[in-house]
Amino acid sequence: MVHFVGAGSGAKDLITVRGMNLLKNADVIIYAGSLVNPELLEYAEDSCEIYNSAYMTLEEIIDVIKTADSENKDIVRLHTGDSSIYGAIREQIEQLNSYDISWDICPGVSSFLAAAAAAGCEYLSLIHI
């Protein structure tokens, strides 16, 4: 099973509780090292295999996932923000579907929501400013 986890808007403590628990229980984590706060990897167990996808092709990422899935390992694909808004997961999901690999999405705190919180107002208030 592959869990697409949204890492939140940058701070280690802005990941969702579900996302943190998925990281804690992961056997394999593939993260976007050029974008994701590396402090989030501190939630992983020492035995977890960690891959920085910043230096990997889509084919290499899918190969890691296929191998881990064939060994019944729990896999986290860690993306920035909320991966269901913008996380470049479509092409990965298409590949996973073609190999009958199960997946789900754990949303993260989006940057536009974090911006509203930092501004001390509601998101809809920002639209009217």
Kindly label every feature range from the protein language model.
Residues 1-5, 71-79, 83:
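Generic beta-sheet signal
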Residues 1-55:
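Glycine-rich, flexible N-terminal cofactor/catalytic loop recognition
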Residues 11, 82-127:
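Class I SAM-dependent methyltransferase SAM-binding "motif I" and its flanking Rossmann-like core
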Residues 16-17, 62, 86-90:
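Conserved strand-to-helix beginnings and helix N-cap segments that scaffold or border functional pockets
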Residues 22, 64-73:
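Glycine-rich phosphate/diphosphate-binding loops that line cofactor/substrate pockets in enzymes
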Residues 30-33, 52, 76-80, 103-108, ...:
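General beta-strand structural signal in soluble alpha/beta enzymes
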Residues 37-38, 58-59, 110-114:
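Short gly/pro/ser/thr-enriched loop/turn and capping motifs at secondary-structure boundaries
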Residues 54-66:
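Glycine-rich, highly charged phosphate/nucleotide-binding loops
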